[in-house]
Design a protein with these regions (language model features):
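Short, well-ordered beta-strand core segments
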Residues: 36, 59, 144-145
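Short glycine-rich anion-binding loops that position phosphate/pyrophosphate groups of nucleotides
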Residues: 41-44, 65-67, 150-153
Length: 186
């Protein structure tokens, strides 16, 4: 039998699902469990993954939010079967290294996306490299968003970026209010 911990959002629907699961399973703390059931929406799942990013655990999401791109439907009758039949997906964090015009370097880690935004009323002038390859020579916009497949249905979708399959090995690079090149959607 799997050793389970349940983490849920605070909304009523999540709490109701949690109470059903707690009545069916003996739950453990994070250290003793080997699977963590996360009840909420995609945002809550991403928060939970980020908060627990150093754990080598399996996370199983149950949707009590809206879209549920990262989550599974809840069925109290089939929960054990659903857990055993679930497809495993590895979500790798995105590392962004940024160097500004004063050569200050910062590193960021994200599960869903990273964004670079203008800091004043003036548009940002950006170039985008992937390793040594220049992808975009000059982008004039309010900023740019680099999204992983896990984040492609959030902010990325709002800026007209593509939805990526969760198993995709791609990243979405989407401009935020681009001025040049015009009509580029990512």
């Amino acid at each position: 039998m799997k050793k389970i911990q349940i983490i849920s959002d605070k909304n009523k629907k999540s709490q109701k699902i949690k109470s059903v699961l707690v009545s069916k399973f003996k739950t453990l703390d994070t250290i003793k469990s080997n699977i963590i059931i996360v009840i909420g929406g995609d945002g809550f799942m991403l928060q939970t993954l980020k908060k627990n990013k150093n754990l080598k655990k399996i996370f199983y999401g149950i949707n009590s939010g809206n879209y549920g791109f990262l989550m599974n439907k809840f069925s109290s009758k089939n929960i054990i079967k659903n857990l055993s039949k679930a497809k495993m997906t590895t979500i790798s964090p995105l590392e962004m290294i940024v160097k500004n015009n004063k050569n200050h370097v910062k590193k960021y880690l994200a599960i869903n996306e990273v964004s670079i935004l203008r800091q004043s009323r003036q548009a940002a002038s950006l170039s985008i490299n992937h390793g040594s390859k220049k992808i975009i020579k000059k982008l004039i916009s309010d900023g740019v968003l680099v999204s992983t497949p896990a984040g492609s249905t959030a902010y990325n979708l709002s800026v007209h970026g593509p939805i990526l399959s969760l198993n995709s090995q791609k990243l979405s690079i989407s401009p935020i209010s681009p001025f040049r090149p015009r009509r580029w959607k990512g």
